[in-house]
Amino acid sequence: MEMFDGLKIYGSGNYLEGVTDRDSLFICAVATTETSRIPGITGAGASPELTEYTPAADVELIVHDAPRCLPEIPQTIVEGEAAPTPAVITKAALELAEVPFMVADAGASVKPDVPYININSEPGGDIRTGRAVTEPQRIYERGLMVGRTLSSLTEHLVVGESTPAGTTTALGVLTALGYDADFRVSASMPHNPHDLKREVVMAGLSNAGIEKGDCSREPFRAVEAVGDPMIPAVAGICMGSTVPVTLAGGTQMTAVCALMRAIDPDFDFSDTAIATTIFVAEDSTSDINRIAEQIGDIDIYVVDPDFGSASHRGLHEYLNGSVKEGVGAGGAMLLALLHGIPVEMVRERIEELCNTILA
């Protein structure tokens, strides 16, 4: 199903009626975990150590046109080729749509040099220990308060995230809640290290004394053992909102939905949708739709910026499987489309930013 050029819809498409031409607000939740330091598990940084800077640098780039916590702009490097951070996609789309951008600290080890809402200040641990997140229910409850407040200021809330190694922690939560997500979460690299992710998750579950599905009635235990702090923060924002919420992200957002379903088995997803990029939706190494359909009737909106037509070589790396999504890129592009901006104009603006701020 396609209603706008560059947009594919998986699901009923009914959600769009409530968010088209509405005042919107975009908030990005930033978080880090020690899991991202495991070699080979993520490409969201030039080295495992630098992944801790990626979320802060991403939102600083959107606000200030340049990172302040790092001398260089975050990028994913595979075989010598650098793919620009998805923050440039988010920045371009939000500028064109004239949508306000906010930041929430869900647990970032490096705090961004921008004004932000403090939901949680403690980063996540290494999920292999089985002790990943401190007080996840408290994080969720603070997210609820943020969702209630922000939804009183707008007609449509879009929530993105920047959490290196977030697909691994998503796999952990999905598995603990009983979902079949093995070999289905995406990755920021062309090679998806499924075996490593599963090994890391199983080590965490073992050390926490948890079997697959054990946490279906104890959802916060799943996050505490093998999750990340972004997941309960964003679940809280979404469940606290009184207006439609677009979860802007890839397979990490299915873990958010799974947590919401476990907290409230009767949760109605008709006012909640996932928006992502074509690079996630058509990734042969993952399956966001198969995960989502296990959880509920969740519309997924997929934006294709047609980077094959881009002249900037770094953007071609997205076509080769690098990056795919992040910082709410898919949701930001959806916002631009909903505000009547053609996808070609979004791509052109992305290229302009790549040629100026990434030069």
From Swiss-Prot:
Q: Which domain of life is it from?
A: Archaea
The cross-references to HAMAP family, in alphabetical order and at most eight, read: UPF0284 (MF_01086)
Name one molecular function that GO assigns to this entry.
nicotinate-nucleotide-dimethylbenzimidazole phosphoribosyltransferase activity
Q: Which family does it belong to?
A: Belongs to the UPF0284 family.
Species in which this protein is naturally found: Methanothermobacter thermautotrophicus (strain ATCC 29096 / DSM 1053 / JCM 10044 / NBRC 100330 / Delta H)
Q: What is the official name of this protein in its record? A: UPF0284 protein MTH_1426
Q: Which PANTHER family match?
A: PTHR38811, UPF0284 PROTEIN SLL1500 (PTHR38811:SF1)
